[in-house]
């Protein structure tokens, strides 16, 4: 559109943005090349004079409202062609012109329908006239004859056309009752016509049919500010001056403006000081959609300044649209919590989600938006099923993953419930008491979940620092994994497997609905529960019901005497009171070892250390000790049990028998049947309840040669698995060492294995192209890929050990990979990783983890650990020799291979083909290792091997070599009797 400098009589095209009276329009350009809203013109129809609407304190001229409504409904929002016929400089250069809607001349239509009269030019303004003046005069005469519009001949029609306006419509808003209007109309759609757009989110509107003139702020959002304004000394230009003078500067003086007209003219009576970016664009966006349009207003509330807050709906063809949502969706307004709280939850959620998407896409006002730093990252594709082993608190569980072998250190996974926070349990070691309702929240989950199969959907991880108030075991940051936990859905007709795969009740929602936790209010870009809205709804119900933490009641006081940290004398003093009770109900709080536990006795309000009478597991550090602990955690951890107390030992540990409450099973049989414990009846089996059941369980394990009985021979004295030096042929492998770790551990490949050659041939045949497109390949933890080794650029099979959470964003993102055929591990960029064909990835890794048998090698961080590592590296990896690896035992406690140092470990004697002594003996001789401590339960063949190795250690000790430089060294902690520590609560 041409600017104000355009010449007259030039036809232009535009769109009608506003109709201010029955003869005046605001027209905007259809296209423009500058930033911001398009230019616009105010055009008064030449030679016409429409009736005047009411001013401040006044009333309408007859038919004024109908005149404006005729023109408004005829052309608002439509494309028109127009030209300027003349200007009147005396009234600020106001432009008068001819406007065509399609083939229709708007001036002719207005006059023809009787909504304006034709103004004859004065003596001084003979040139200020419409080019269609003759036709207009003829049409006016016809309208008068027919009685159309203002020329109506119906008696009383003129008086009836005058609106009965309330004070707010004529400039007197002092007595306007906003609260009364809200009370009468809240939530009900009200018809209205928008008279002015103050800014993108504030409109002034006539509410029909009473014509209340009100200002409405769009609920839930705020558009950029139009800036502060300063009053000027210039006279206000009457926007409707043409309704009287139509170019005649000598016309009579007009009365005062109404509130609506005064506000419409405010742009001329003030000077813009400053405005926010996109303020003009937001205002124009709203003007283009609702200015002078029919809208529906739904009042939602009133603020402290008596301003009305509401939702604004307008029609776009056959569709009804929400102005607020449209503004936010187009990046022209921001979400505002305080007024959004007046909306219903669904509308509030939609508005918030729309803003978040705009921020992510950096639309308009969010173009330079930088999200705040977040310590949470999404977790993808890590759903699993498992059994709940432990309830740590009201918002944290330990779940045993069904897919990971029993006994593996990685089987138990700690899962924090997403987006909720329960009262903290405190820390007895720091003398921190549980918060109110913390015990109730934990107990609720314990009774609901312990031993139950659950479905876990991991959602995000969060880095927690000590300053965040979360108790951590170390001083550094800790990464916690959050997810949603569900009980399986009890669907009829489903198999157990199908039911287990269908999520049922959300545990977090159960906690929140009972008032035992609160929902975390996340920041915009923080990861959150996928069921966040359900959690908020549950919290609202709990607050309304004043449940637990939302009530005014204090939580029940509970004082527990912890005898596990008390003196042995106090425990002995307590013994008679426990012996008097036949069977004591208790809860297993913690598994201290395979046969020793911390129990809570509700009836006595005390915690005790408890051990089985006559049943003993391997000691700490001995074979199968960790497996025994893992078994008892799954079987009785946090379960309800019954105990009989027989005695107390010198450390204050109570001795007796225990039964799992539901099954009435003697808990000692779990260990004995699994071959993880043995009977000790030196003081008489007759004193042990159900001793015959325990003996049967032990006999069954012996017959099956389970665990500690694997080398048992009937009739011979057994010391943890063997009775004499075995004559069985031990497995011997011919190997080469491929990687050396610390502590006497290393990886080998079997020499002559056809799998090695097959894998190498398959890799050589691969054609590796360019790096995959970002986003098309997102390897996750545990996946097998091809990775390029940094030292020789060769491509090898590798397992992802660690990587970025979520989708890959850059080729430089780093992944930690474990080369499954060689045993080494390194960090490589995404560009050095390729997907691998299943035919190549399906074969097991060729690298086998081994450990030198019968000796203890210092770790890399210990004294002489570096020397030991370098020596082992020199005699194995650097020498390139082949070795015989005699397998003494297999350690399966490492579970599945998850990275370097995990998986099944072969405990071997390593002998070079051309050497006389083993590497094990050589390291003892060099003083960079020492022998394992002899234990009573060791097999006789192991004791014989230790006898043979002892001379090499004695030689190093006598010559003060290596670790023996300063004489005998103290045994490590494993060799000493462990000091009893306070049990964890």
From Swiss-Prot:
GO cellular component, one term: endoplasmic reticulum
Disordered as annotated region, ranges: 228-255, 963-985
InterPro entries according to UniProt: Silence_cplx_Nase-comp_TudorSN, SNase_OB-fold_sf, Staphylococal_nuclease_OB-fold, Tudor, Tudor_AtTudor1-like
Chain positions found as Phosphotyrosine: 966
Location of this chain's protein in the cell: Cytoplasm; Cytoplasm, Perinuclear region; Endoplasmic reticulum; Cytoplasmic granule
Listed GO biological process terms: cellular response to heat; gibberellin biosynthetic process; mRNA catabolic process; mRNA processing; positive regulation of gibberellin biosynthetic process; regulatory ncRNA-mediated gene silencing; response to cadmium ion; response to salt stress
Predominant subcellular localization, coarse grouping: cytoplasm
PTM annotation (N-acetylalanine): residues: 2
Domain of life of the organism encoding this protein: Eukaryota
UniProt keyword list: Acetylation, Cytoplasm, Endoplasmic reticulum, Hydrolase, Nuclease, Phosphoprotein, Repeat
Disruption of the gene: reported phenotype: Normal vegetative growth, flowering time and flower morphology, but delayed seed germination after vernalization (at 4 degrees Celsius); this phenotype is reversed by gibberellic acid (GA-3) but increased by paclobutrazol, a GA biosynthesis inhibitor. Reduced expression of enzyme involved in GA biosynthesis leading to reduced levels of GA-4 (e.g. GA20OX3). The double mutant tsn1 tsn2 exhibits severe alteration in germination, growth, and survival under high salinity stress. In normal conditions, moderate reduction in root growth due to cell elongation defect.
Domain TNase-like: 10-153, 188-368, 382-552, 582-711
Regulation: Repressed by the specific inhibitor 3',5'-deoxythymidine bisphosphate (pdTp); this RNase activity inhibition impairs subcellular relocation upon abiotic stress and leads to reduced stress resistance.
Class in the EC hierarchy, top level: hydrolase
Molecular function terms from GO: mRNA binding; nuclease activity; RNA binding
The keyword Transcription is assigned to this record: no
Modified residues (Phosphothreonine): 961
Database matches in PANTHER family: EBNA2 BINDING PROTEIN P100, STAPHYLOCOCCAL NUCLEASE DOMAIN-CONTAINING PROTEIN 1
Domain commentary: TNase-like domains are required for relocation to cytoplasmic foci upon abiotic stresses.
Purpose of the protein: Cytoprotective ribonuclease (RNase) required for resistance to abiotic stresses, acting as a positive regulator of mRNA decapping during stress. Essential for the integrity and function of cytoplasmic messenger ribonucleoprotein (mRNP) complexes called stress granules (SGs) and processing bodies (PBs), sites of post-transcriptional gene regulation during stress (e.g. salt and heat). Involved in gibberellic acid (GA) biosynthesis and seed germination. Essential for stress tolerance, probably by regulating mRNAs entering the secretory pathway.
Official protein name in the record: Ribonuclease TUDOR 2
Originating species: Arabidopsis thaliana
Gene: TSN2
């Amino acid at each position: 559109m041409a600017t104000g400098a355009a010449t007259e009589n030039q036809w232009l095209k535009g769109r009608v943005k506003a109709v201010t009276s029955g003869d005046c329009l605001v027209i905007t350009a259809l296209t423009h090349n500058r930033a911001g809203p398009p230019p616009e013109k105010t055009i008064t129809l030449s030679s016409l004079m429409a009736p005047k609407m009411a001013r401040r304190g006044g009333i309408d001229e007859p038919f004024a409202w109908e005149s404006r409504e005729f023109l408004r409904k005829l052309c608002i929002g439509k494309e028109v062609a127009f030209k300027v016929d003349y200007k009147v400089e005396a009234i600020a250069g106001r432009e008068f012109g001819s406007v065509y809607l399609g083939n229709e001349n708007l001036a002719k239509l207005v006059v023809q329908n009787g909504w304006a009269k034709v103004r004859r030019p004065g003596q001084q303004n003979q040139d200020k006239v419409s080019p269609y003046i003759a036709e207009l005069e003829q049409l006016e005469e016809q309208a008068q004859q027919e009685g159309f519009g203002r020329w109506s001949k119906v008696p009383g029609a003129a008086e009836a056309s005058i609106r009965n306006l309330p004070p707010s419509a004529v400039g007197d808003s002092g007595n306007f009752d906003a609260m009364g209007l809200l009370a009468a109309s809240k939530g009900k759609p009200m018809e209205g016509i928008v008279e002015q757009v103050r800014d993108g989110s504030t409109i002034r509107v006539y509410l029909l049919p009473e014509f209340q003139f009100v200002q409405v702020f769009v609920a839930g959002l705020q558009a950029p500010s139009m800036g502060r304004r300063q009053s000027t000394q210039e006279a206000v230009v009457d926007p409707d001056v043409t309704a009287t003078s139509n170019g005649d500067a000598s016309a009579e003086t007009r009365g005062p403006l109404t509130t609506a007209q005064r506000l419409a003219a405010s742009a001329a009576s003030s000077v813009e000081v400053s405005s926010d970016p996109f303020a003009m664009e937001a205002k124009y966006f709203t003007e283009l959609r609702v200015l002078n349009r029919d809208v529906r207003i739904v009042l939602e509330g009133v603020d402290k300044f008596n301003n009305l807050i509401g939702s604004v709906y307008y029609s776009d063809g056959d569709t009804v649209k929400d102005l607020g949502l449209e503004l936010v969706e187009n990046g022209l307004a921001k979400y505002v919590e305080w007024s959004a709280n007046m909306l219903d939850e669904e509308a509030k959620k939609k508005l918030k989600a729309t803003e978040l998407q705009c921020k992510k896409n950096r639309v308009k006002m969010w173009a330079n938006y930088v999200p705040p730093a977040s310590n949470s990252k999404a977790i993808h594709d890590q759903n699993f099923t498992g059994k709940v082993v432990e309830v740590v608190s009201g918002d944290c569980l330990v779940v045993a993953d069904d897919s990971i072998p029993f006994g593996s250190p990685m089987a138990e996974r700690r899962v924090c419930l997403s987006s909720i926070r329960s009262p903290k349990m405190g820390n007895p070691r720091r003398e921190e008491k549980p918060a109110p309702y913390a015990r109730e929240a934990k107990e609720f989950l314990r009774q609901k979940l312990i031993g139950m199969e659950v479905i876990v959907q991991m959602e995000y991880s969060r880095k927690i620092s000590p300053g965040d108030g979360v108790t951590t075991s170390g001083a550094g940051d800790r990464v916690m994994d959050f997810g949603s936990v569900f009980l399986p859905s009890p669907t009829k007709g489903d198999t157990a497997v199908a039911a287990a795969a269908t999520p049922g009740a959300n545990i977090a929602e159960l906690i929140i609905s009972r008032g035992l936790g609160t929902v975390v209010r996340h920041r915009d870009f923080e990861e959150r529960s996928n069921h966040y809205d359900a959690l908020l709804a549950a919290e609202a119900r709990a607050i309304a019901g004043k449940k637990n933490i939302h009530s005014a009641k204090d939580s029940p006081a509970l004082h527990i005497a912890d005898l596990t940290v008390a003196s042995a004398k106090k425990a002995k003093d307590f013994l008679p009171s426990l012996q008097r009770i036949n069977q004591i109900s208790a809860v297993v709080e913690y598994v201290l070892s395979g046969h020793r536990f911390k129990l809570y006795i509700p009836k006595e309000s005390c915690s005790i250390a408890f051990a089985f009478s006559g049943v003993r597991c391997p000691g700490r550090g001995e074979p199968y000790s960790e497996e025994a602990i893992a078994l008892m955690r799954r079987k009785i951890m946090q379960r309800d049990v019954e105990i009989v107390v027989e005695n107390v030992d010198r450390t204050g540990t109570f001795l007796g028998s225990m039964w799992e409450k539901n099954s009435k099973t003697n808990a000692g049989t779990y260990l004995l049947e699994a071959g993880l414990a043995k009977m000790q009846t030196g003081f008489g089996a007759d004193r042990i309840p159900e001793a015959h059941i325990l003996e049967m369980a032990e006999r069954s394990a012996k017959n099956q040669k389970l665990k500690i009985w694997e080398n048992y021979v009937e009739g011979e004295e057994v010391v943890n698995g063997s009775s004499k030096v075995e004559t069985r042929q031990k497995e011997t492998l011919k190997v080469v060492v491929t990687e050396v770790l610390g502590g006497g551990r290393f990886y080998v490949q079997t020499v002559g294995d056809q799998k090695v050659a097959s894998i190498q041939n398959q890799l050589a045949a691969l054609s590796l192209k360019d790096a995959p497109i970002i986003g098309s390949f997102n390897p996750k933890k545990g996946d097998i890929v091809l990775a390029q080794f940094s030292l020789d650029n060769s491509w090898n099979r590798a397992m992802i050990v660690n990587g970025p959470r979520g989708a890959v964003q850059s080729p430089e993102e780093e992944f930690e990979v474990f080369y499954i055929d060689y045993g080494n591990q390194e960090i490589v960029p995404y560009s050095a990783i390729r997907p691998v064909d299943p035919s190549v990835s399906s074969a097991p890794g060729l690298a086998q983890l081994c450990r030198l048998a019968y000796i203890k090698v210092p770790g890399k961080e210990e004294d002489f650990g570096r020397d030991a590592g370098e020596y082992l590296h020199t005699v194995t990896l650097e020498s390139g020799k082949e070795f015989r690896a005699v397998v003494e035992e297999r350690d399966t406690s490492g579970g599945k291979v998850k990275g370097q140092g995990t998986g099944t470990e072969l405990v071997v004697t390593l002998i070079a083909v051309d050497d006389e002594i083993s590497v094990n003996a050589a390291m003892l001789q060099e003083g960079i290792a020492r022998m394992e401590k002899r234990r009573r339960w060791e097999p006789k063949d192991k004791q014989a091997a230790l006898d043979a190795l002892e001379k090499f250690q004695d030689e190093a000790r006598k010559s003060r070599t290596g670790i023996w430089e300063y004489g005998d060294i103290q045994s490590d902690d494993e060799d000493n009797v462990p000091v009893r520590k306070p049990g964890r609560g």
